[in-house]
């Protein structure tokens, strides 16, 4: 079945991301002028570079698989109906051209390019590329790989030893208070300002979890799959795995099922 093989060659993707990074992203890092930065929906910034990178990736990926669909963060801001592509049986690329745009614009190193390939509501392959350091992690049906090694998450962390993020921005009042109240139960709560870089570090055992509210697919499909295929765990509050193809909310992603359930328990879910 098509799920058992790599649909696209990892080296092709790595090369595309490396080239786009060296051609478009890195030359602008630390060199952005204010007129290259704008706001969408009053709070999220977008740079000319995000838009250029997305266009470039679209042109490459549409050639790799004929008739494939494309969901990009910047394309979505012009046409939200593209999320319907997940309901079709076409291959669909999901792209976050620069995850951590704010960091990128402030010359902070934590940002990533994230890509996923899905079909029939299944995630098939995912890729995260960090331009600073040229770090590349990917996952397919056989597992998660970094630096030519298969990564197996074996950390069995408890809440009091856990480091992670709790995004309180989009919860309603009641839940928000609860989330603020539980922060002290963990070893450390902080955010990178790039969820892609957080997922990367959950796989490497540097972090342990992320508790999320608003779920845009380009922010989460790549990283959730990479964590899942490394032996980590993801679930909505109903304990079912992430449904990227629905307008779902509230997700916990962690290094183990036990930790996810402990966190859900703590917030009373």
What label would you give each PLM region?
Residues 154-269:
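An extended, acidic
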